[in-house]
């Protein structure tokens, strides 16, 4: 894969950039672009709670349609499930030859929910971190790795523009990796479902329930199966699998090697393959959009059930004993009817 550490800053500086949305990724992109000297405006719906925040931070704020008409580059950074409706109602009519449409995640392009005119460049810049870290590393003089992809390139310069955009938000300090909309979308969704959100949550709950059902205190089960997971994930994050195993006790390392494969066995791998196939075929995308269009009843049901799970009850009590957990820096995308953040941020 090609990795870029340099860009032509003039490409994005010669454009007017409309960032649609001011949530986790939107605020970071807009502020970083602004501080890099790019002519940027934020497009928000009327009544958005993000309007005063963006204005207080020195940004120009417009209605979404106004911003789309003003921008040479329109960067769509609202949740996946809202993008199609917003694009068709407010943005599509302004996508004229010579303009460019950007995304922070490939969902709506890859699954053909948004189909821009052929004369419009379509690109993606996807930082591989939450928005608050995109912003913090930029202000520290560095950046986070970004993925860049192109779906349409009538100008012949869409990838160069994407890399220039990534440079303006700090991405070239860490590296901008060329990919495709297909690969970014499918790996992102699979990772969320099988490992990061779905798989890890199911594993945590199963471990907690196994200990509690065997008669162990809920508090100990919480510490061993949820709280201490951060210690291990931080080691993965810092140095990979080998570094984690080098950092734990020999007892823990041996137990992990010999028992871990019994948890993630061939049956689990078969389920992972099935999940991947559902992502690749578009089955999951269709299922999720249908769920959303029906008012998300299953999502609401799952949220309510999780709130009542014993691991949440005991966790709330134990976290109250940990005052250092109060400084949460994360922010969800707010410029939408709900606050879901599906622009990994993948999430994700």
Curated annotation (Swiss-Prot):
Residues annotated to bind substrate: 249
Domain annotation KARI N-terminal Rossmann: ranges: 1-179
Gene3D superfamilies, sorted: 6.10.240.10, NAD(P)-binding Rossmann-like Domain
Name this protein carries in UniProt: Ketol-acid reductoisomerase (NADP(+))
Annotated disulfide bonds: none
GO CC terms, sorted: cytosol
Cofactor entry: Mg(2+)
Catalytic-site annotation from UniProt: 105
Occurrences of domain KARI C-terminal knotted (ranges): 180-325
Binding site for NADP(+): 22-25, 45, 48, 50, 80-83, 131
Functional description taken from the UniProt entry: Involved in the biosynthesis of branched-chain amino acids (BCAA). Catalyzes an alkyl-migration followed by a ketol-acid reduction of (S)-2-acetolactate (S2AL) to yield (R)-2,3-dihydroxy-isovalerate. In the isomerase reaction, S2AL is rearranged via a Mg-dependent methyl migration to produce 3-hydroxy-3-methyl-2-ketobutyrate (HMKB). In the reductase reaction, this 2-ketoacid undergoes a metal-dependent reduction by NADPH to yield (R)-2,3-dihydroxy-isovalerate.
UniProt-annotated binding residues for Mg(2+) 1: 188, 192
EC number: 1.1.1.86
Pathway stated in the Swiss-Prot or TrEMBL entry: Amino-acid biosynthesis; L-isoleucine biosynthesis; L-isoleucine from 2-oxobutanoate: step 2/4; Amino-acid biosynthesis; L-valine biosynthesis; L-valine from pyruvate: step 2/4
A single MF term (Gene Ontology): magnesium ion binding
UniProt keywords, alphabetically: Amino-acid biosynthesis, Branched-chain amino acid biosynthesis, Magnesium, Metal-binding, NADP, Oxidoreductase
Name of the coding gene: ilvC
The reaction(s) this protein catalyses: (2R)-2,3-dihydroxy-3-methylbutanoate + NADP(+) = (2S)-2-acetolactate + NADPH + H(+); (2R,3R)-2,3-dihydroxy-3-methylpentanoate + NADP(+) = (S)-2-ethyl-2-hydroxy-3-oxobutanoate + NADPH + H(+)
Protein's GO biological process: isoleucine biosynthetic process; L-valine biosynthetic process
Cofactor remark: Binds 2 magnesium ions per subunit.
Biased composition (Low complexity): 339-348
Region of interest (Disordered), ranges: 323-348
Recorded family membership: Belongs to the ketol-acid reductoisomerase family.
PANTHER family assigned: KETOL-ACID REDUCTOISOMERASE, MITOCHONDRIAL
A Pfam family this chain is assigned to: KARI_N
